[in-house]
Amino acid sequence: MKEQDHDRLLRIKTEGVREWQHQSSHYNRYEATPYSALEILFDEYDEWKSTDRFVDFGCGKGRFPFYVYHHLHASAVGVEMNGQLYQEAMENLAKYMERAKSSRASIQFEHIFAEGYDIEKEDNRFYFFNPFSLQIFQKVIDN
């Protein structure tokens, strides 16, 4: 299935690459994880539970949280520092919720730097797709 077909199925728009001018070298461009990679990840590691709570650091437009909820019915939090991407994730959430089978889909987005996100006790699965430098990664891990 093509990227746009997956997006259409989920009623979201996450395709594309976005370079940022005047951005710190610690934060990388926007590029969503390919759906084919997500399929491999979830096929390879089948120990996921619907009670898990996934946190996607550098979630961009939210592809990973929507994929997690749609396929596992697990909670997902997207953490995004870029205001424009955060807004697009929120627009995707509104579109997803319009036609979601459950109006209580547990997907949320936080507009905050990854190193500022407070890990909650429910958070037990963490996802990173090249969102930032090793220095920022270390700060997140220290949390």
Could you tell me what each predicted segment is?
Residues 84-85:
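Conserved short alpha-helix immediately C-terminal to the canonical SAM/SAH-binding motif I
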